[in-house]
């Protein structure tokens, strides 16, 4: 059997949010296989929903630059050693100038950035001079630019503290609709900054991932139901266990079967057929909502809109399409958070874990 180290337990705990001993036991049961341990915890209802890694360590700022004609949007992350420097006016100016430089020169990589010329010198030398003046090591960690295609539009949003930045691109069927969609895209960027979707839509989800997440969802709901049965609180009824987790699983045949079942129920209730068309769409929407809980957690289009939580982002866009008189298709979004995926120095925590194993 593989040796289960404190560092392994720490990593699994930070990735899943499960308890320390639960993580140790999961690693033991899976012979130290990290991915299998994550899935085991999820199936036991002990791990949080799978998301992108969120261990934040580095300080710094995220910057966003949207071109005046809304055809190009750039987001960048520059790291500093301390939060104090991240609030420094010179550092803030550096992030803005660098982002504008990246966009205006259509740079594609950090290596290309360091070789580019800014203010008459190589960016690499320019950054060194900034490091010498500011007094901390500074690193351009990453950046990305979205371009609008024909009849397309981009926009962006930077959260007020500069730790989260979002850029987004949409394709429209006319320049007029693209122009009208600018504010909508900015509002959707604000939603993304708040809700952090991992995917654009259910179509981007892998079926194996969906099936595994369904098992975890059922385990989580059953665990909550067990607690609700124990408490016997009339204001907290048991969760209904869904048949599916995502629209990815809802084939035409499944949707047709659900519709036929609704018709049978309406017939049994004695509802006249002439009003069925007014009832069925709402019941089908409820069926889809009940069986796409994973989408509402992880996908932009499936999430409930932060500015109107009775509608999904997809529904809000559909309403705007009618208002603007044309199609609006979100093509891509990118969200950066300062330090995302970087790890703190946690020797003390590892020692704490080791002491309890």
Swiss-Prot record:
GO terms for molecular function: translation elongation factor activity. Associates with the EF-Tu.GDP complex and induces the exchange of GDP to GTP. It remains bound to the aminoacyl-tRNA.EF-Tu.GTP complex up to the GTP hydrolysis stage on the ribosome. Residues 82-85 are annotated as: Involved in Mg(2+) ion dislocation from EF-Tu. Keywords: Cytoplasm, Elongation factor, Protein biosynthesis. It holds the Pfam family EF_TS. It is found in: Cytoplasm. Belongs to the EF-Ts family. Coiled coil: none annotated. The keyword Cytoplasm applies. Gene3D superfamilies: 1.10.286.20, DNA helicase RuvA subunit, C-terminal domain, Elongation factor Ts, dimerisation domain. It comes from Campylobacter jejuni subsp. jejuni serotype O:6 (strain 81116 / NCTC 11828). Its main location: cytoplasm. Transmembrane segments: none annotated. NCBIfam families: tsf. InterPro entries: EF-Ts_dimer_sf, Transl_elong_EFTs/EF1B, Transl_elong_EFTs/EF1B_dimer, Transl_elong_Ts_CS, UBA-like_sf. This is Elongation factor Ts. One of its GO terms (cellular component) is cytoplasm.
């Amino acid at each position: 059997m593989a040796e289960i180290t404190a560092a392994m337990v720490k990593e699994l705990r930070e990735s899943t949010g499960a308890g320390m001993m639960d993580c140790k036991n999961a690693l033991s049961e899976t012979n130290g296989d990290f991915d299998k341990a994550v899935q085991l915890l999820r199936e036991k209802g002990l791990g949080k929903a799978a998301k992108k890694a969120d261990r934040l360590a580095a300080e710094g700022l995220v910057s966003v630059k949207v071109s005046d004609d809304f055809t190009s949007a750039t987001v960048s992350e520059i790291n500093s050693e301390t939060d104090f420097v991240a609030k420094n006016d010179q550092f803030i100016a550096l992030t803005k100038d660098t982002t504008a430089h990246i966009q205006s020169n259509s740079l594609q990589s950090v290596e290309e950035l360091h070789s580019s010329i800014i203010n008459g010198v190589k960016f690499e030398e320019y950054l060194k001079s900034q490091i010498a003046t500011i007094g901390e090591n500074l690193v351009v960690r990453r950046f990305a630019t979205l371009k609008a295609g024909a009849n397309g539009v981009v926009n962006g949003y930077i959260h007020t503290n500069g730790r989260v930045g979002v850029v987004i691109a949409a394709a429209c069927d006319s320049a007029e609709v693209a122009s009208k969609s600018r504010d909508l895209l900015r509002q959707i960027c604000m939603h993304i900054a708040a809700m952090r979707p991992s995917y654009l839509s259910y179509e981007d989800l892998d079926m194996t991932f969906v099936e595994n997440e369904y098992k975890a969802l059922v385990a989580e709901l059953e665990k909550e139901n067990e607690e609700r049965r124990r408490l016997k609180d009339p204001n907290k009824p048991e969760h209904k266990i869904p048949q599916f987790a995502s629209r990815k699983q809802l084939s035409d045949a499944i949707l047709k079967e659900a519709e036929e079942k609704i018709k049978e129920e309406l017939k049994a209730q004695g509802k006249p057929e002439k009003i069925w068309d007014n009832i069925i769409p709402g019941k089908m929407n409820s069926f889809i909502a009940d069986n796409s809980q994973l989408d509402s957690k992880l996908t932009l289009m499936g999430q409930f809109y932060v500015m109107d939580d009775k509608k999904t982002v997809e529904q809000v866009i559909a309403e705007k399409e009618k208002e603007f008189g044309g199609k609006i298709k979100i093509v891509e979004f990118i969200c950066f958070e300062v330090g995302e995926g970087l790890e703190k120095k946690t020797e003390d925590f590892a020692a704490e874990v080791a002491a309890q194993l």
